[in-house]
Amino acid sequence: MDPSGPGPSSAAAGGAPAVAAAPQPPAQLSRYESQKRRDWNTFLQYLRNHRPPLTLARCSGAHVIEFLRYLDQFGKTKVHASGCAFYGQPSPPGPCPCPLRQAWGSLDALIGRLRAAYEESGGTPESNPFAARAVRIYLREVRDSQAKARGIPYEKKKRKRSQAAQPAGVEPSGSSSAAAAAAGGGDAGSGGGAAATTTAQPGGSGTAPSAS
């Protein structure tokens, strides 16, 4: 036997190469998580473009309110002024020059996402500017003023009564069904991403948000 010939280890090395495991695709984010990430990036861009420059550590509830007012230029919800003939009418019969604003429901949902994103990014609940009392008061004022201007009251949905409490064979009345259907509706802009794709530039215009 020729000692210079290929040994067992050489034969193994010359075999078929091992197949590397395919990398696992990244987990797809939910719609909420994707929206939250876009909103957070938009707010950070707003801070970078702020004049004078503003860091997240120095951001306060007043700056958050300033951001919400800035977003109004991208709004799609008609909010009638007190002197408008259509003030308080939910379905005005014609056009008017009143401004478009971000709907209260959109702003409320936006603040909820930004509040969560702030703490997920390392911020503490105590220093969270999106949870500031001033922000809550501002949102309440927006809700009340838009409810009066648009003639659409914002009421909390009442919990449905247990079906077990009703006598057997008795169905809910038509009025109750209609009320439940009405309670399920609301502002078309509620829960939308007010700042989803906004190019945040405090001093100028940007791309309109995906919903208002």
From Swiss-Prot:
- Record GO cellular component, one term: nucleus
Region entry Disordered: which residue ranges? 1-34, 148-212
Q: Where in the cell is it found?
A: Nucleus
Spell out the Gly residues composition-biased ranges: 183-194
**The motif Nuclear localization signal: which residues?**
156-160
Renumbered to this chain, the Low complexity biased-composition regions fall at 1-22, 167-182, 195-212
Predominant location: nucleus
What GO biological process terms are annotated to this protein in UniProt?
A: mRNA transcription; post-embryonic plant morphogenesis; response to light stimulus
Please name the InterPro entries in this protein's record: ALOG, ALOG_dom
Q: Per UniProt, what is one GO molecular function of this protein? A: DNA binding
Q: Which UniProt keywords apply?
A: Developmental protein, DNA-binding, Nucleus, Transcription, Transcription regulation
Q: Any idea where the ALOG domain is?
A: 31-158
| Function noted in UniProt | Probable transcription regulator that acts as a developmental regulator by promoting cell growth in response to light.
Please give the PANTHER family that the UniProt record associates with this protein.
PROTEIN G1-LIKE2 (PTHR31165), PROTEIN G1-LIKE7 (PTHR31165:SF78)
The family assignment reads:
Belongs to the plant homeotic and developmental regulators ALOG protein family.
Q: What is this protein called?
A: Protein G1-like7
